[in-house]
């Protein structure tokens, strides 16, 4: 919300993936920007398609990696290529909400990839693996100039003291983090295998949810 308020004006363009997190388009439209959708390849964000949608009016590119609701991701080589191919005046926002679940060699979190870039914002949240969605708390990384712009428009007291305290405790609890990752891997595989047995198509995922296609399912919801 703050990013859109700070950097968008009427008739600016924002590029998002076809099946991206809905909040990007909501806040972009609230700030009178035009949302441009880049087609995905097999429910995976396509860097080439995103770049094809960029125009002189483009101000922000949002990308969740891994993506919600598809559960897919783009590798570190591709997301770095995206930043390098974008104009320097285009802000790239990398949503790392599910990064704690990722343990793949070709994946890297946005914070490590873009720590030296001045035109990237990386966002993180305590709502997913930490289970603190009700506290509405997260954090972000960006250059000093971007952070200053966000601070100038943020409402006062937008994060409560209990939320801050809980987040500070949670981020140090590595035992909980590792337990949740093991739990996710066990049950995501079980769900994936079960859906395959039921002939229900779903993509493989590295996060804590599955995207399910019921188009070809010839069973009632009770049977499923």
Q: What label would you give each PLM region?
A:
Residues 30-35:
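A short helix-loop-beta submotif of the ANL/AMP-binding
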């Amino acid at each position: 919300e703050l990013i859109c308020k700070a950097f968008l004006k009427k008739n600016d363009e924002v590029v998002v993936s076809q099946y991206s997190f809905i909040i990007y388009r909501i806040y972009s439209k609230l700030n009178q920007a035009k949302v441009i959708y880049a087609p995905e390849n097999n429910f995976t964000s396509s860097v080439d398609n995103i770049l094809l949608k960029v125009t002189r009016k483009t101000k922000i590119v949002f990308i969740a990696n891994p993506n919600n609701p598809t559960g897919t991701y783009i590798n570190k080589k591709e997301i770095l290529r995206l930043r390098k191919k974008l104009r320097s005046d285009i802000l790239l926002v990398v949503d790392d909400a599910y990064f704690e679940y990722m343990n793949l060699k070709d994946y890297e979190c946005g914070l490590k990839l873009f720590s030296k870039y001045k035109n990237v914002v990386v966002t993180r949240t305590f709502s997913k693996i930490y289970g603190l969605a009700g506290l509405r708390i997260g954090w972000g990384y960006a250059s000093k100039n971007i952070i200053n712009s966000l601070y100038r428009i943020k409402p006062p007291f937008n994060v409560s003291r209990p939320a801050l305290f809980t987040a500070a405790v949670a981020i140090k609890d590595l035992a909980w983090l590792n337990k949740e990752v093991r739990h996710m891997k066990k049950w995501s595989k079980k769900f994936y295998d079960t859906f395959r047995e039921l002939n229900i198509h779903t993509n493989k995922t590295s996060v804590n949810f599955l995207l399910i296609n019921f188009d070809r399912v010839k069973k009632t919801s009770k049977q499923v």
